[in-house]
Amino acid sequence: CMSNTRKSFLTSLSSLGLVSSLLLAGCAGGTSSAGSSEPSAGASSGDSNASASQSPIVEGKGASTRLAITYDGGVMVYDGKDMKLLQDIHKDGFLRLNDAGDNRHLIVADGSSYTFLDTGVWSVAHGDHSHYYTTAPSLSTLSLQADHTGHVIADNGKVAAFADGTGTFDVYDPANLVSNKRTATNLETKQVKLPNPHHGFAIPLPNDQYLVAVGDSKTRTGAAVVDANGKTITENKECPGVHGEAIARDNTFTIGCTDGVLIYRDGTFTKVTNPQDPYSRSGNQAGTADSPYVLADYKTDKDAKLERPEKFAIIDTVAHTREVYSLPKGVSYTFRSMGRGPNGEALLLTTDGKLRIYDPANGTELGSVQLMNTWSESETWQDPRP
């Protein structure tokens, strides 16, 4: 079961004006300098979507899947197998979806809060098999307040939801999201405060530690590991323009810089660069906890308002390399069109309408599927695109 920031094979459907999408399959549940950390009630839930949230719970013969898609005005939840619309939930704002960590709930970020969406599919392990359940999808009012919602990351049995406007992140145990088979009415959280507000992230590590970005509202300069009180344990300041992170095998993590990437494992940071390209930003990455390889974008035009990259990179977290590969001339991709396949394949949905499949070990293109017509990227990052 997924409990980390690996990226699944999913795309948004630009023809419908959709903003973001996330697929969830019912599987067994369960799955940074001076600051302070205090336990709190954190989140509470009232009577929202009452009819849906109290819908019957049905046991099925096998696992079900749900596909949640945001649009300008709400969230639509579909059956992941036959694409039947199950629920159209109204919610204002520019909405983004995140994994809530328990393989049942999603987090809906609207800029000022993280609200929990019950997709209505889950399973319970029972000896050598599992029991599978479904109910109607519903948006609870169980939420976390956040000044400028940003990255939400689940790993090592915890979830950290970052607030860019305050430089704080709330941590919770995803096992506590359910009570009596329904979304819990309260959620205990612990808040960790970093020195300065910034567009950052926090990755839960073992031993109640967190891998975080370091910076302020103007610049981001590196990464650090902090404890539950926000105290720095170790730090690396050699990562200008920090953006993007991914989880790889063996509790290894990659962090994007404007001149390369940082690889973190077992208390040690390693900087990886490509000297032929002094400016080489890999600010978006797609990893999986089952693979040592991380797919990353590769941008080399420092002055471009919008660079449409025609190269991509694969980071080897064991060999400490970032290999660069070229797409056909005139073909590019965006931060939304990167993913990983069921066996760790590197996936790119490119502007020629193809889903390209690569072997991450050597960058070989294994094949492609023509999914749509050619398309181009909008200069407004919030606009929908494949």
Which residues are covered by each model-predicted region?
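Beta-propeller fold detector
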Residues: 86-93, 124-145, 179-199, 233-238, ...
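Bacterial signal peptide processing site
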Residues: 28-31
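Long, acidic/polar, low-complexity amphipathic helices and coiled-coil-like
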Residues: 130-256
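C-terminal motif of bacterial Sec signal peptides marking the signal peptidase cleavage site
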Residues: 23-26
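Acidic, serine/threonine- and glycine-rich low-complexity intrinsically disordered segments
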Residues: 214-342
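Post-signal peptide N-terminal segment of secreted/secretory-pathway proteins
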Residues: 72-169, 178
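Repeated scaffold domains used in trafficking and secretory/extracellular systems
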Residues: 51-59, 91-104, 138-157, 191-206, ...
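Short beta-strand elements that form the blades of beta-propeller/WD-repeat-like
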Residues: 59, 63-71, 103-110, 114-115, ...
